[in-house]
């Protein structure tokens, strides 16, 4: 079974490398830890500390790929909203020169305006090695106009 390195950065940890390094766990334990966080309480703390963020950082020790799920303190809705950032590379085709030329640019998979359940789904997909699925969701997300929490 694959193990994942888990770090959690709380709002009071303001240094760039400040985070609680909790160790290596299997995917089931990581999901339990994600569910165990009092996200509403973290949101209140973030707002009290002027937007310092809470991050749930998971690294696949085999591939070195990392995802960071960040609680968005300044969401436009009343619901919890998350962002997902990663170091997982993805090639994106972009049109230039009035749409006549297409070039590929390297980007990293990321998502904004995620609900807690959607963020957990993406976390599970990452831990199950479903990177191609995340890439497809990212590409699909790029082609959609912006909307509120999904």
State where each predicted segment sits.
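Short, highly charged C-terminal tails/helix-capping segments
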Residues: 135-150
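Generic signal for short, ordered secondary-structure residues
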Residues: 9, 13, 101-105, 145-146
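N-terminal domain-start interaction segment
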Residues: 1, 16, 79-83
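Negatively charged, low-complexity tracts enriched in Asp/Glu with abundant Ser/Thr
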Residues: 2-66
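Amphipathic protein-protein interaction modules
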Residues: 59-131
């Amino acid at each position: 079974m694959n193990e994942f390195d888990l770090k959690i950065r709380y709002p009071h940890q303001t240094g760039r490398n400040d985070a609680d390094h909790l160790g290596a766990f299997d995917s089931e334990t990581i999901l339990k830890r994600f569910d165990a966080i009092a996200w509403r309480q973290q949101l209140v703390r973030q707002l009290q500390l002027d937007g310092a963020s809470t991050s749930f950082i998971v690294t696949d020790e085999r591939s070195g790929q990392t995802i960071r799920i960040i609680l968005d303190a300044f969401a436009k809705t009343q619901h919890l909203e998350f962002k997902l950032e990663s170091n997982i590379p993805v090639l994106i085709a972009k049109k230039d020169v009035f749409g006549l030329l297409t070039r590929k640019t390297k980007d990293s998979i990321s998502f904004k305006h995620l609900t807690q359940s959607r963020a957990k789904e993406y976390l599970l997909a990452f831990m199950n090695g479903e990177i191609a699925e995340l890439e497809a969701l990212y590409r699909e997300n790029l082609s959609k106009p912006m909307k509120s929490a999904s």
